Regions:
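Residue(s) in the substrate-gating loop at a strand-loop-helix junction
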Residues: 143
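Substrate-binding pocket helix/loop in short-chain dehydrogenase/reductase
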Residues: 99-100, 107-112, 213
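Short C-terminal tail/terminal secondary-structure segment
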Residues: 2, 148, 233, 244-259
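Active-site helix of classical SDR
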Residues: 123, 159
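Alpha-helical segment proximal to the catalytic Tyr-Lys
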Residues: 128, 172-176, 241
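Active-site loop-to-helix junction immediately N-terminal to the catalytic Tyr of the SDR YXXXK motif
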Residues: 103, 149-157, 169, 197
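Canonical Rossmann dinucleotide-binding motif of NAD(H)/NADP(H)-dependent dehydrogenases/reductases
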Residues: 5-36
Length: 259
C-alpha cells in the first residue's frame, strides 16, 4: 500500500492499547492516518498514542468502555466534533475458555456485552457520523472461531459469530452509502493475552506450550499482530474499494488445510 494512501484519514481503533489493536494503530499511523486510540485502559491508550507520536505519526487517545452506551456516545461525539471519522476498527474484545457445560451465565453475558454489544455500539456511533460525510470504512475483528469448531471456546465462538453476522448485515444495509464493512477472522495470533495465559496456566513451561500452540497452525506458527495490521491497512485503503461484506480468513491454513 502506498505510504500516502491513508493521508488525512481519521481512524478510530477500539482496543488500541494492546495486541492486534495496538499494531493496527501503528500501521495506520505509518500510512499517514490520524489515529484515535480507544481503550478501557486510559494509561495504556495514552502510551500507545505517545509511541505513535514519538515515531512521527499522528495519534490521540481517549478512554472508552465499548460496552457502555454513554461512554461510546461521548467518545464518538468528542471525536466527530473535531473532524471526520473515516475509519472504524473494532478490535476491543475479551476471551474466555470453556465449554457450554463449564460456561457460567455471567461469563456468557460478559463476553456478549464486550464483544457483541461493544461492536454494535461503536458501529452505530461511527455510521451516524459517516452518513453525514462522504462515507467510511469499518473493519471488525472476528475470528476463525466464528466459522470453525474450536474446543473450549463456546462463549467466545458465540460472540465472534455474532460479529461476523453483524458485519454482513451492516455491509448490506450500507450499500449505496459509500460505507464498506468487512471483518478479519484470524486464527491464533501471538499477543500479550497468549503470553499471559501461558504464564498463568503453564508456569515455567511457556516456551514449550508456545511451540505446541504453533504446531496447531498448518503453516507452523502463530500470526503476528503486525501481519493482521497489514491486512487492515489494505482494507482501509482505496485499493480495497471494491471489497465489502467480506469475512477474510487470516488463518495460516486452519480452515482449509488441517488434517
Amino acid at each position: 500500500v502506498n505510504g500516502t494512501e491513508l493521508n488525512s484519514k481519521v481512524a478510530v481503533v477500539t482496543g488500541g492499547a494492546s495486541g492486534i489493536g495496538k499494531a493496527i494503530c501503528a500501521a495506520l499511523a505509518a500510512h499517514q492516518a490520524h489515529v484515535w486510540v480507544l481503550d478501557i485502559n486510559s494509561a495504556a491508550a495514552q502510551e500507545s498514542a505517545a509511541e505513535i507520536n514519538r515515531a512521527g505519526g499522528q495519534a490521540s487517545s481517549l478512554p472508552c468502555d465499548v460496552a457502555d452506551p454513554e461512554s461510546v456516545s461521548q467518545v464518538f461525539n468528542d471525536i466527530a466534533s473535531q473532524g471526520s471519522i473515516d475509519i472504524l476498527i473494532n478490535s476491543a474484545g475479551i476471551a474466555h475458555i470453556g465449554t457450554i457445560a463449564t460456561t457460567s451465565v455471567e461469563d456468557f453475558e460478559r463476553l456478549f456485552r464486550v464483544n457483541v454489544r461493544g461492536t454494535f455500539l461503536c458501529m452505530q456511533a461511527a455510521i451516524a457520523v459517516m452518513l453525514k460525510q462522504s462515507g467510511g470504512v469499518i473493519i471488525n475483528l472476528a475470528s476463525m472461531a466464528a466459522v470453525a469448531g474450536i474446543p473450549d471456546r463456546f462463549a467466545y465462538s458465540m460472540s465472534k459469530g455474532a460479529v461476523r453476522a453483524m458485519t454482513l448485515s451492516v455491509a448490506k444495509d450500507c450499500l449505496g452509502k459509500n460505507i464498506r464493512c468487512n471483518c478479519i477472522s484470524p486464527a491464533r495470533v501471538h499477543t500479550p493475552f497468549v503470553d499471559g495465559y501461558l504464564k498463568q496456566n503453564y508456569p515455567g513451561r511457556e516456551a514449550e506450550m508456545l511451540a505446541e500452540l504453533a504446531k496447531t497452525q498448518p503453516i507452523g506458527r502463530m500470526a503476528r499482530p503486525e501481519e493482521v495490521a497489514g491486512l487492515a491497512v489494505y482494507l482501509c485503503s482505496d485499493l480495497a474499494s471494491f471489497l465489502t461484506g467480506a469475512d477474510l480468513p487470516f488463518d495460516g491454513g486452519v480452515l482449509n488445510l488441517r488434517g
